[in-house]
From Swiss-Prot:
Omega-N-methylarginine modification, residue list: 390
Cellular-component GO terms for this entry: chromatin; cytoplasm; nuclear speck; nucleolus; nucleolus organizer region; site of double-strand break
Pfam families: SIR2
Cofactor note: Binds 1 zinc ion per subunit.
GO biological process, one term: DNA repair-dependent chromatin remodeling
Protein name per the record: NAD-dependent protein deacetylase sirtuin-7
Organism, scientific name: Mus musculus
Binding site for NAD(+): 108-127, 168-171, 269-271, 298-300, 316
Amino acid sequence: MAAGGGLSRSERKAAERVRRLREEQQRERLRQVSRILRKAAAERSAEEGRLLAESEDLVTELQGRSRRREGLKRRQEEVCDDPEELRRKVRELAGAVRSARHLVVYTGAGISTAASIPDYRGPNGVWTLLQKGRPVSAADLSEAEPTLTHMSITRLHEQKLVQHVVSQNCDGLHLRSGLPRTAISELHGNMYIEVCTSCIPNREYVRVFDVTERTALHRHLTGRTCHKCGTQLRDTIVHFGERGTLGQPLNWEAATEAASKADTILCLGSSLKVLKKYPRLWCMTKPPSRRPKLYIVNLQWTPKDDWAALKLHGKCDDVMQLLMNELGLEIPVYNRWQDPIFSLATPLRAGEEGSHSRKSLCRSREEAPPGDQSDPLASAPPILGGWFGRGCAKRAKRKKVA
């Protein structure tokens, strides 16, 4: 015993060795119990049966872990309604669309997978592949075009059946589908838009190329400057872990107002794992009877399934094709010559041509963008934007370190 009644150094070391030994014995017992539980009951020896009886707490813990793993696995599985069931559900959804006084659509990455832009949590999603240690790739994002779902939403808005669209997507495809900017809230930004935050109000620059080449988490300067004040421009992307503060294109004010007025919400292609964290979108302060009716289209489980009036297990394009048929509405075909981005875009100034190396959009696939001598139809390695690729790289690095 050391002076003053405390333990001596050798006594502390001995106590630490005893603690570590007990922990190792507990881990070994846990491994033994786990191996026994993997066997069928008829295959267990009498000694193994006694060990399980003496380790009720460990058995309970391991069985609980197994149930949780199975539950998570089931939630990640994609489920498809059979064709007849899906048609029945779409008829019900069509009735809800017709009778809605204020319908708001929430969209996620699942509506853009048909444009070869991967989602995040599907079987071939970004996070899913990274968790498995597999590489992530995507087609050049400048080649993506609005999907059948994007064009259907635009037609529904034209017909005043949809009042507002709230999107998590950064791909700019809602804007390019012809949806008015006042009708969109791009909560996580738009890869084609950079802004000057020194100008009041903020000055926006819509481009025909991905502006996020040099940007990443907490690094948003694009390398170009404002035509009016000369301040460095920044992208509009809200990365995971960031809080969006820009007025546009996030348009939170309109999203909140639309949600407060909504009597019906249609969620398309979103896991809702991020959107559920935005309480302003769900009117949870209202009594249950006054909350909007929720309709969800997704192949996987979502945390809002229990709140939904109807869950449709199907691909967004398939569901929207059936819905538009049921409503008797023709789906417009996307035409690059009519893409609004070309009339909204601000051209680069002299000397800015080398400020990016991304392929620019052009009205025709045969037409090479100014300064672009490459063959637009030639195959090229996939290019990931800063909003997309940098996040993938960070996740992969964390996975490798772990």
